[in-house]
Amino acid sequence: MTEIERQDTDILILGSGGAGLFAALHAQRTAPELKITLAVKGLICKCGCTRMVQGGYNVALGGGDTVERHFMDTIIGGKWLPDQDMAWRLCNLAVERITELENEVGCFFDRNPDGSLHQKAFAGQTADRTVHKGDLTGIEIISRLMEQVLRRPVEKLQEHRAIAFIPATGGEGLSGVLFIDMRTGKF
């Protein structure tokens, strides 16, 4: 029989992309007494999509742009396939997120001569909406998020691939996740 190592945590986050790292930061800030674990199939911030972002982060900051226009560009660009409630939430919270990325996480984005954030339009956008750091926006965001997470008491499981969800007794929710440690082959 294969021996399985057991670890307990209060909050388990799978993935160390932008969403995973933001989740870890928000969980730790909201409930610092809880044990938070970040599990990633590779190395923290060396895998995932966020680090590959070249374009930037879309946010309606005025100058003729609105959250409504951002939302419609998102829906039309997605050929009406996006979940509209989620798309609205994404567009509506974008100003809050860009402020958080700059003021709390420490990201630096390109600026106009007057000091305002530089924005440019990408395919399908009806306004200059994309905040960026040259063409390395993803690396800027993921690097600053990683710095913040590494400063906090968040357990990190690197090179651990989730291979099965373990349902809770009664079928309501999950009681665990089965991982394989990619370095050792152990569960």
Named regions from a protein language model:
Residues 6-9, 183-187:
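Core beta-strand elements of the Rossmann-like FAD/NAD(P) dinucleotide-binding domain
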Residues 1-13, 100:
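Glycine/serine-rich loop-strand microenvironments at binding/catalytic pocket rims
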Residues 11-38:
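N-terminal Rossmann-like FAD-binding beta1-loop-alpha1 element of flavoenzymes
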Residues 3, 34-35, 40-184:
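Conserved N-terminal/central alpha/beta ligand/cofactor-binding core
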